[in-house]
Regions:
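Glycine-centered structural positions embedded in regular secondary structure
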Residues: 13, 82-83, 232
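Helical hinge/lid and interdomain linker segments adjacent to catalytic or ligand-binding clefts
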Residues: 25-35, 65-75, 125-233, 237-239
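Oxidoreductase and adenylate-handling cofactor-binding alpha/beta cores
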Residues: 239-246
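N-terminal signal peptide c-region/cleavage motif recognized by signal peptidases
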Residues: 17-19
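Hydrophobic targeting/anchoring helices
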Residues: 22-130, 139
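Hydrophobic helical h-region of N-terminal Sec-dependent signal peptides
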Residues: 8-15
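Bacterial N-terminal signal peptides that target proteins for export
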Residues: 1-8
Length: 247
């Protein structure tokens, strides 16, 4: 009886040990909990690219990420200077139960695939115009720069996600006309836009930009994701709405 009791004790001890061991890695994203937020996004992308599933915990500690516990994930976090916390199954289940409570304004979104990212940016861009590529580069998230030639040759089909920022799809040469139209860089930018439109077979920049906007619209209709910011948000819709109107 004593031997059986001892065996039972050992089994229970092992089960408790297994249930409390580390099984997940949490990347906290609140301001005070994460020392490098951009690199944390990069770790998440890297994990997805390695075929790990990641849970995005919306509204939980700044939108934290929950990854499987693996030696290579811990090592990569340490190399990139990303704050991480090691959680047991029990602790993880407690967090997920709290998030799923109807009384909480939180949600768990499972991420399964690393998207192929394209950034729409001109070849002759100015450094201050391209914070997006600077951020992605620092975060170590891979991306491809594309512009009108690539869009019009249907290369958007190669990507899952398209990012737009400083672009005037109406063909009016951007919002800087009022203050910078006499500066050398703006004059060169305008000349480059006109030369590209002519090269692609269009008489006017506005016609060429409308064709680009239509290709992007079709990309979104076909299931592609687009994130637009700055002048791209308004000018994209205006260009499509103004088709047939010389603005």
């Amino acid at each position: 009886m004593k031997i059986k009791g001892l065996n039972l004790y050992i089994i229970l001890f092992l089960l408790c040990s297994l249930s409390s061991r580390a099984s997940f890695v949490l990347l906290p994203m609140e301001a005070e909990g994460q020392q490098n937020h951009l690199k944390a996004y990069g770790i998440t992308y890297w994990a997805l690219d390695k075929s790990y599933k990641v849970s995005w915990l919306l509204n939980y500690r700044g939108g934290s990420f929950l990854l499987p516990d693996a030696p290579e994930i811990r090592k990569e976090c340490q190399i990139r200077g990303v704050t991480f916390e090691v959680l047991s199954d029990a602790a993880t289940n407690s967090i997920l139960e709290d998030i799923s409570s109807p009384s909480q304004n939180m949600e768990t979104v499972v991420l399964e695939k690393a998207p192929k990212i394209a950034v729409y940016t001109p070849k002759g861009k100015q450094p201050w115009d391209d914070a997006v590529t600077m951020v992605l580069t620092y975060a170590e998230i891979p991306y491809t720069e594309i512009y009108d030639e690539e869009v019009l040759s249907d290369q958007l089909l190669l990507y899952d996600w398209l990012h737009l920022h400083h672009e005037d799809f109406t063909g009016q040469y951007g919002k800087f006309f009022g203050n910078y139209r006499s500066t050398p860089w703006y004059i060169q930018q305008k000349a480059d836009a006109e030369a590209l439109a002519k090269k692609l077979g269009y008489n006017k920049v506005s016609e060429e930009k409308l064709a680009v906007a239509k290709k992007i619209r079709d990309f979104v209709i076909g299931g592609g994701f687009m994130f637009a910011m700055c002048s791209a948000t308004d000018s994209f819709d205006i260009a499509l709405s103004a088709e047939g109107v010389d603005i």
